[in-house]
Amino acid sequence: MKKQNNLRSLAAQAVELVVEQGQSLSNVLPPLQQKVADKDKALLQELCFGVLRTLSQLEWLINKLMSRPMTGKQRTVHYLIMVGFYQLLYTRVPPHAALAETVEGAVAIKRPQLKGLINGVLRQFQRQQETLLNEFATSDARFLHPGWLVKRLQNAYPTQWQHIIEANNQRPPMWLRVNRTHHTRDGWLGLLEDAGMKGYPHPDYPDAVRLETPAPVHALPGFAEGWVTVQDASAQGCAVFLAPQNGEHILDLCAAPGGKTTHILEVAPEADVLAVDIDEQRLSRVYDNLKRLGMKATVKQGDGRYPAQWCGEQQFDRILLDAPCSATGVIRRHPDIKWLRRDRDIAELAQLQAEILDAVWPRLKPGGTLVYATCSVLPEENRDQIKTFLQRTPDAALSETGTPDQPGQQNLPGGEEGDGFFYAKLIKK
């Protein structure tokens, strides 16, 4: 069956679901991808990610060029116009094709009477583009982040906040993790070169490789056989700090989708690993990852605040707590985060993190290691969280990562490096 859906209208619907209904793009996009031909999937993804990355700018332009916002049943048209702006500003789609296809999108969303309006706004933008962009360059919207997040970053990083924002607005590099049970990193890099691709090793994380140019996973040597996994370099730091050993009982808490679970088992194939996550649906991806890599772990659904429900009285040699967080360190990878999070979420997340930490600490054996990690850059979830935990937990000591006054290691997103990530390694006295 030939797939004939209008890409621009699908992108507009996806962005509307994210911004208006708070759905994540990772949930919204896959069903829409099924509606388009394989050759068009990359463009649909580019339009969705791109519009969400630059949403502040596109919204600003609409407010300049339209006297009143589109509301109610016409709201999708608002996002369709954004898709048009994005193509004209950021893609290599020829302007005449961008205009024609975007205008035609009105028919696909059953608003053919608005074709003239869409065409008029996009043509007006083309005529005024230089003037508008000069004005935009001095507006608050130029940071492409919600105001509350800009303020938090300015407060937390007085000299680095612009670097963080610029990094968040870039396209992310593609990092891989070589499965050391199959190949050395250098050995796999040789296979990659034989396949006509180039990769670069990370200086600190022994399994990490950055592709010179992102590629589909099926093109990677041995991906289906489990020789390599897509995982950001910073996420690989979790297993480095955890340093799992064969024969140990290890808890991976908040484990989905299973990237860190499988990394633990690559480092320590004889470890006994329990992977727990609250989200039953996302646990299916843990099973998928274990299966592709040919590994075994115990996988359970459970709430980190109530360990008795999923592990009884069991104690562990090592615990990895990749805590639920604002994900403000991975915005370049998931631009919808900027529009899904709210300022009030941060205090709620910090409270949840503290509850999980307090609940699982008694499950760590004396002398054991707990690595607390987040993909956040906000101190409330990171340094402040660990500082207060150490103050109220006399048998916890910091190891390798920072000082009691400035606990943990904070990686900031940037360039070809890894995502924004925080780690604190704690030892039980």
Curated annotation (Swiss-Prot):
Its main location: cytoplasm. GO terms for cellular component: cytosol. The keyword Metal-binding does not apply. Its EC number is 2.1.1.176. It holds the Pfam family Methyltr_RsmB-F. Keywords: Cytoplasm, Methyltransferase, RNA-binding, rRNA processing, S-adenosyl-L-methionine, Transferase. GO terms for biological process: regulation of DNA-templated transcription; rRNA base methylation. InterPro entries: MeTrfase_RsmB-F_NOP2_cat, MeTrfase_RsmB-F_NOP2_dom, NusB-like_sf, NusB_RsmB_TIM44, RCMT, rRNA_ssu_MeTfrase_B, rRNA_ssu_MeTfrase_B_ent, RsmB-like_ferredoxin. Gene3D superfamilies: Helix hairpin bin, NusB-like, Sun protein, domain 3, Vaccinia Virus protein VP39. S-adenosyl-L-methionine binds at C254, A255, A256, P257, G258, G259, K260, D277, D303, D322. Residues 397-419 are annotated as: Disordered. One of its GO terms (molecular function) is RNA binding. The active site is at C375 (nucleophile). HAMAP family: 16SrRNA_methyltr_B (MF_01856). Specifically methylates the cytosine at position 967 (m5C967) of 16S rRNA. Belongs to the class I-like SAM-binding methyltransferase superfamily. RsmB/NOP family. This is Ribosomal RNA small subunit methyltransferase B. The gene is rsmB.
